[in-house]
């Protein structure tokens, strides 16, 4: 339980500190990747939601 709590704290700390980097811009050569880079911080939340959906599918055994 403590390990899960630590991972959650690390995740929230990294998202808080990574928000300071939102003012940075990608180089022009990589400008087409801007939409993907904008979505990347949300990807770990998709895995969290996937875990709940998976457990609901197997009836929380």
From Swiss-Prot:
It is a single-pass membrane protein. Its main location: plastid. Residues 1-24 form a propeptide. InterPro entries: PSII_PsbK, PSII_PsbK_sf. One of its GO terms (biological process) is photosynthesis. Pfam families: PsbK (PF02533). Keywords: Chloroplast, Membrane, Photosynthesis, Photosystem II, Plastid, Reaction center, Thylakoid, Transmembrane, Transmembrane helix. It is found in: Plastid, Chloroplast thylakoid membrane. The chain crosses the membrane at residues 40-60. One of its GO terms (cellular component) is chloroplast thylakoid membrane. Disulfide bonds: none annotated. PANTHER family: PHOTOSYSTEM II REACTION CENTER PROTEIN K, PTHR35325. PSII is composed of 1 copy each of membrane proteins PsbA, PsbB, PsbC, PsbD, PsbE, PsbF, PsbH, PsbI, PsbJ, PsbK, PsbL, PsbM, PsbT, PsbX, PsbY, PsbZ, Psb30/Ycf12, at least 3 peripheral proteins of the oxygen-evolving complex and a large number of cofactors. It forms dimeric complexes. One of the components of the core complex of photosystem II (PSII). PSII is a light-driven water:plastoquinone oxidoreductase that uses light energy to abstract electrons from H(2)O, generating O(2) and a proton gradient subsequently used for ATP formation. It consists of a core antenna complex that captures photons, and an electron transfer chain that converts photonic excitation into a charge separation. Belongs to the PsbK family. This is Photosystem II reaction center protein K. It comes from Arabidopsis thaliana (Mouse-ear cress). The gene is psbK.
